[in-house]
Structures are given as C-alpha cells and as structure tokens.
Design a protein with these regions (language model features):
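Active-site-proximal alpha-helical scaffold in enzymes
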Residues: 83-102
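Conserved "HGTGT" condensation-loop signature of ketosynthase/thiolase-family condensing enzymes
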Residues: 1-80, 100-101
Length: 102
C-alpha cells in the first residue's frame, strides 16, 4: 500500500476557550466521542494514537501513553509528535506511515 492510499476519515475539535474549567482529559474524551460519532467506529477498533504535545502535558514524556490510559484505549501504536508548529502535519504523516506498515 502506498502512503497516498491512506485517508483521513474523520476529525474532531474542541471549542477554544481561554482558561477553560474543563480538564484536559475531559477535552480528550470529547474529541474521542466526536471522532467515534463521526466515523461510526467503535472504541475497541482504535489501535493507534498519535498526539502533538500540549502545554498541559508538555512536561510528561509519556503524554500520548498517559492520554491513551486516561481514555481507556488499548493500542498497538502510540506516539507523541513534538516538532513545533509542524506537529499536526507530522502526526498525519506518521499515522499514514504506521497504517502503511501495518
């Protein structure tokens, strides 16, 4: 399979609020619920997670693994992308490569 054979089938985002009272894990759950609703996938079908580091979890070198644990995801692949402003694009490229690798 070529990298161009992979597709983004859904996305979700949270409302951007300055100094939100919502916990970072609640935001993660909101994103997960939105993606599951949009795609029709079941939570158990998710086998990989790639996140960019956040200001909230920047000090946690296991940010993506901690997030997966908090969301009760059982994964085969989990990674944090921390390459500055290009982290979102880097995350998409790594996800495509991970899917391509099986």
């Amino acid at each position: 399979m070529a990298l161009r054979d992979n597709a983004i089938v859904g996305y979700a985002e949270t409302k951007i609020v300055l100094r939100s009272e919502v916990d970072v894990w609640e935001l993660g759950a909101e994103i997960l619920d939105g993606i599951l609703e949009q795609t029709g996938f079941e939570k158990g079908e998710i086998d990989g997670l790639i996140l960019s580091s956040s200001s909230t979890g920047a000090g946690n070198i296991f940010w993506s693994q901690t997030t997966a644990d908090q969301l009760a995801l059982e994964l085969d692949f989990c990674q944090t992308v921390d390459i500055g402003g290009s982290s979102p694009v880097g995350a998409v490229a790594r996800a495509a490569a991970a899917i391509d690798a099986g």
